[in-house]
Amino acid sequence: MVGIKSDVGNVRELNEDYAAFIEDERFKIYLVADGMGGHNAGEIASNLAVKSIMRYLMEHSEENEDLLLNSVKYANNEIYEISQKNDKCKGMGTTITGCFIKGDIIQVVNVGDSCCFSIKGNEIKKVTKDHSWVQELIDAGAITEEEGRVHPKKNIITRALGTNSSVKIDIFNIDKNESTMFLLCSDGLSNEVQKEEMVEIVNRYKNVNEACEKLVDLAKARGGKDNITVLLFGGEV
């Protein structure tokens, strides 16, 4: 079961988030990207990131070693090359967070401040770590997590796909017994909705699409200052 919902929010004119998934007999991949850049460049970057990763995985699925990592490197190169050739796309970039399943392998990938959470029963755990200026302040002990949530510069990220010719990519290996569901989202959701509220909504609504709708509705009710995207998948809730 897969639920997916992307909304422009209450303030922005353009939705620069993009989410998609493939459930193939060879592998499964679930992705959320949050683009940035002038004109429509953010929308181009997020769309290109997701589609490039999917294309690479489809064409190289027989590879076993570093398949997910290589697919994200490929996407980074695709975005960067276009940004160098097209003035309207110059400086564009995107976050990416995703979950890849192949056989007994479960991997989560992250660049930027989109998030992946694992859910088991009433427990929810953030798998990814934000690549953001505020997260660095939290890690240094300069501010608390609560202060970070309302910090005026919380949207400044320290890593993105496509802004440089190379990028540092986080890969997390997940124990298949650790989780029954995964929730991927852009910061438009995670900035407005606490993880404890996320798991409560996921468990309350038995339909994953309905749960996604309710999560987006809650983020919009709290201001909806950014685009909001959520992708929820796993077994029966």
Predicted regions and their residues:
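PP2C/PPM-type serine/threonine phosphatase catalytic domain
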Residues: M1-V237
